[in-house]
């Protein structure tokens, strides 16, 4: 199948909300069949998640309160990528800020594109 036949083209775009962390946009798009439709989506700067293994082989987790669900969770260290920041620098910074640990060795494990599911 030719993927080009699936592409939606942006006709217009407007901000709905601009916050400190994320931005909500509403776009009017031209569908492959020629009709138009609205798409609402969230722009996020990206984030890293750190899978830190201690010398004893245990994984490092932290407890975080998440306001949106009013609960404390056990989570892997993570954080958003600042503008112009390399993801590895973000990972180093977040590990140090959130846990007090620094890693002597880093290995990139992969990338997940979460925004495709919004």
Give the location of each predicted region.
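Extended interaction-bearing regions that mediate binding to partners or small molecules
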Residues: 1-17
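A short, polar/charged loop/turn motif at coil->beta-strand junctions and beta-hairpin connectors
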Residues: 4-5, 18-23, 70
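Conserved Nudix-box catalytic region and its N-terminal flanking loop in Nudix hydrolases
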Residues: 5, 39-42, 48-93, 97
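Acidic, metal-coordinating catalytic segment for phosphate/diphosphate chemistry
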Residues: 12-49, 55
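Glycine-centered flexibility sites
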Residues: 19, 34, 46, 78-79, ...
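Active-site segment of metal-dependent pyrophosphate-handling enzymes
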Residues: 23, 45-46, 53, 66, ...
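Hydrophobic residues on conserved beta-strands that form the core of alpha/beta folds
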Residues: 24-26, 38, 62, 76, ...
């Amino acid at each position: 199948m030719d993927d080009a036949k699936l592409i939606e083209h942006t006709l217009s775009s407007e901000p709905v909300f601009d916050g400190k962390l994320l931005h909500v946009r509403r776009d009017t798009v031209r569908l492959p069949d020629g009709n138009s439709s609205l798409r609402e989506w969230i722009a996020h700067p990206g984030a890293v998640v750190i899978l830190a293994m201690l010398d004893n082989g245990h994984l490092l987790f932290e407890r975080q309160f998440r306001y949106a669900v009013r609960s404390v969770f056990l989570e892997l260290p993570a954080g958003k990528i600042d503008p112009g920041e390399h993801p590895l620098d973000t990972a180093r910074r977040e590990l140090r800020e959130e846990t007090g640990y620094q890693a002597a060795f880093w290995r990139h494990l992969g990338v997940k594109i979460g925004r495709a599911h919004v």
